[in-house]
Amino acid sequence: LLRFGDSGFPRQQLQFAVNEMKFPNANDGKLLQPGEWYHVAVTYDTETKAAIMYVDGKEQSRIDDYGNGEAINLGKQKKGDFMFKIGHSYGDPDDMSRQLNGEICEVRIWNVLRSQEEIYRNMYDVDPQTTGLKAYWKFNEGKGNNIAKDLTGNGNDAVAYTTAIWPEGIEVPQKNKE
């Protein structure tokens, strides 16, 4: 679960949680500012059990010996199942108190460990056929469609639980261009 804040955490701090394990600890120096676009990536090494959070292609937080990673089920799920969600925290999908108050441009799911260099280089663009890329949603489908197509061709299309809102005219600043 990648989320903003929690009980005892600043509201603008990203936090990664698996079961009862959370990282990083509360830290006002790691706040994300409202109204700004950020590229966020989290990697998990199944061999070393290390999890790393990157913000704008730079390592922001790291934790070693972070539990036992399990595969994410991207398949269509029934209400009541542990569900993979984008823009909504855990719990019942009808509970709108746990949804993200913000916008998401893209989401990618990999089954290979990405290096900091790869994350930085591909912050804004990646070939959908790249080895290990299991799902890739751009969230630019347009009006009236509640399905975000999986660009990898793996069939992991994302279906909105409620009516999708497709903002227009979003320009995401490319922070990795020198």
Regions found by a protein language model. Give the residues of each.
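Extracellular glycan-associated modules
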Residues: 1-156, 161-178
